[in-house]
Amino acid sequence: MYKKILVALENSPADEAIVPHVAEMAKRLGSEVLLLHVADGWVARNFNQLKLAESEEMKTDRAYLEKIAVQFRAQGLTASTLLALGDPPKEILKAAESEKCSLIAMSSHGHRLLGDLIFGSTIHEVRHNTSIPVLLVRAEKK
């Protein structure tokens, strides 16, 4: 059913909610997993235009993606990584389309009101601008 699952990661504790769900689903369905993080700091947003060197944040993000990929591979799953640069919702949608993903998986913070305006916009934009199914798992508040 879901041949390739895109997992949008934040490099934050919220990822702990989505990773086990996707791993279990991928095992049961024989799905491939694409782990995606979108770096959206100043360097990331201007990286190509200004031919900038990779920032420490971007290096940390690459290492984080690989660490999570190793966890998936240790369970016998096929996992690849992608560090995208720019606006998170746009890059998630672009990667899901270009990589022919059949499911987008994300963690939700469960914000309300102002928090939705600030933090919930990525999920809102992704789920309202794709025909690909979106799996949301609520992250525990810590």
Each PLM stretch: what is its role?
Residues M1-A17, H128-K142:
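Intrinsically disordered or low-complexity boundary/linker segments at protein termini
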Residues V70-I104, K141-K142:
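Structural beta-alpha unit
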Residues K3-Q49, Q71:
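Small/aliphatic-rich secondary-structure junction motif
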Residues S107-H128:
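Glycine-rich, Arg-bearing micro-motifs that act as flexible, cationic patches
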Residues H37-V38, S107-H109, R138-A139:
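Short secondary-structure boundary segments
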Residues L52-A63:
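A short acidic, glycine-rich active-site loop
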Residues L50-E54, S98-K100, T122-I123:
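Short, hinge-like loop/turn segments at secondary-structure boundaries
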Residues L36, S80-A84, L135:
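General small-molecule cofactor/ligand-binding pocket signal
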